[in-house]
Swiss-Prot record:
This is Putative auxin transporter-like protein 4. InterPro entries: AA_transpt_TM. It is found in: Cell membrane. It comes from Oryza sativa subsp. japonica. Keywords: Amino-acid transport, Auxin signaling pathway, Cell membrane, Membrane, Symport, Transmembrane, Transmembrane helix, Transport.
Length: 480
């Protein structure tokens, strides 16, 4: 049974771990001692590096997926916002993102409980956000969730690919950024071989360590470098409203990484333990993003307005090269996080999601990478593209739709009475929850989508007018 479990993981079948773990333990007692020992050894190695599903795995996945390349663009956002607004928006959107991630987790548990009461078996099926919406609210909600979620994850993958090319250029500028995009597109395509979020255990752990190093490198390097001439941090939006709301929307994007919440929960052995995980992950992420962005802005001030990648302003040293390499590896991992749900959707569309072998599924997934590759070459605007995606996609995908879906699901009195996860009294019960949801919808609709969409569009069009589509080397210094 244990060896079958290992094969199941490799093939990408998503079996309930608690039931299977119990069966494995029971069978191991009655098997031959030598065979049982070998199986246990294989299973131990697989579990250590390959097969995660604990609360800690979920925490590492959430934190690792949330921070990634945005660490390098947040100083740019601070230069657009000013120090006080930059700090305030990070804390505010961090809390708001944690709230909507909690709502998504509640809806997942509600959907899964209802379906399992109807004897639906999810052993060979990964539940996704659009299916939760479909099961709870119907096909119109499903279509909206599918459209926004897939489009966001598509561009989220594009952003990781753009970031890879932008970063590697700072340690090897013999090739332009567009050529590096081609190269890293081929490298990132290897994520088709990772079956599910179960299998990111060691990668999410290493990814977070790598980004932690990069964050503290930025902080220390900025302080050691000291203030440049003319670096006078502003306290508010003293430039233009376009810059201000573009920066705010980039932070909205930063804390909107919970579009993969359902897939992470489904990979857990006990998904109901997820409720506070995203908040805990956000708390750690803030210890990385706040010091690094504040220190960089303190040191370089308005110079960041023309350098959306923080690496561009720091002198080349072995410490910076190490940070670049580690960030590249983490961006490869984050590309997999963003792309894996798209792989699942595509597998379901062409009918290979259930029981196909790992090689067949990998081959079937390859077409998903091609449009990502193409879009990264068309729009290589590292930094401005984050705000555009944040305003038009993140606003709806992980803020507005979850809040509205939660209210619609539990609007009937019977649904509230029979809720699997009723809101805690500390949050005001149902009235407090509904009030918080209404605030999220109104705020994000007006500030994130409205003002943020306007500002991000203006800024994005400026980048196109200045650099053009398919530009070979976005924001590269002139060669002498």
């Amino acid at each position: 049974m244990a060896s079958e479990k290992v094969e199941t993981i490799v093939a990408g079948n998503y079996v309930e771990m608690e039931r299977e773990g119990a069966a494995t333990a029971g069978e191991g007692v009655g098997g031959a001692a030598a065979a049982s020992g070998r199986r246990r050894g294989k299973l131990a190695v697989s579990s250590l590096f390959w097969h995660g599903g604990s609360v800690y795995d979920a925490w590492f996945s959430c934190a690792s997926n949330q921070v990634a390349q945005v660490l390098l663009t947040l100083p740019y956002s601070f230069s657009q916002l000013g120090m006080a607004s930059g700090v305030a928006f990070q804390v505010f959107y961090g809390l708001m993102g944690s709230w909507t991630a909690y709502l998504i987790s509640v809806l997942y548990v509600e959907y899964r409980t209802r379906r399992e009461r109807d004897k639906v078996d999810f052993r060979n099926h990964v539940i996704q956000w659009f299916e939760v919406l479909d099961g709870l609210l119907g096909r119109h909600w499903r279509n909206a969730g599918l459209l926004f979620n897939c489009t966001f994850l598509l561009f989220g993958s594009v952003i990781q690919l753009i970031a890879c090319a932008s970063n590697i250029y700072y340690i090897n500028d013999r090739l332009d950024k567009r050529t590096w995009t081609y190269i890293f597109g081929a490298c990132c395509a290897t994520t088709v071989f990772v079956p599910s979020f179960h299998n990111y255990r060691v990668w999410s752990f290493l990814g977070l360590l790598m980004t932690s190093y990069t964050a503290w490198y930025l902080t220390v390097a900025a302080v050691v470098h000291g203030k440049v001439d003319g670096a006078a941090p502003r306290a508010g939006p003293s430039k233009t409203m376009v810059l201000y709301f573009t920066g705010a929307t980039n932070i909205l994007y930063t804390f909107g990484g919970h579009a993969v919440t359902v897939e992470i929960m489904h990979a857990m052995w006990r998904p109901r333990r997820f409720k506070m995980i995203y908040l805990a992950a956000t708390a750690y992420v803030l210890t990385l993003t706040l010091p690094s962005a504040a220190a960089m802005y303190w040191a370089f001030g308005d110079a960041l307005l023309d350098h959306s990648n923080a690496f561009a302003l720091l002198p080349r040293t072995p410490w910076r090269d190490a940070a670049v390499v580690l960030m590249l590896i983490h961006q490869f991992i984050t590309f997999g996080f963003a792309c894996t749900p798209l792989y699942f959707v595509w597998e379901k569309a062409i009918g290979v999601h259930g029981g196909a072998g790992v090689l067949r599924r990998a081959a079937a997934r390859l077409p998903v990478v091609l449009p990502i590759w193409f879009l990264a070459v068309i729009f290589p605007f590292f930094g401005p593209i984050n705000s555009t995606v944040g305003s038009f996609l993140v606003s709806f995908t992980v803020y507005i739709i979850p809040a509205m879906a939660h209210m619609a699901t539990f609007a009937p009195a019977a649904a509230r009475e029979n809720a699997v996860e009723p809101p805690p009294r500390a949050l005001g019960g149902w009235p407090g929850t509904f009030a918080a949801n209404c605030f999220v919808v109104a705020w994000v609709l007006v500030v994130g989508f409205g003002f943020g969409g306007w500002a991000s569009t203006v800024n994005f069009v400026r980048q196109v007018d200045t650099f053009g589509l398919f530009t070979k080397c976005y924001q590269c210094p002139p060669r002498h």
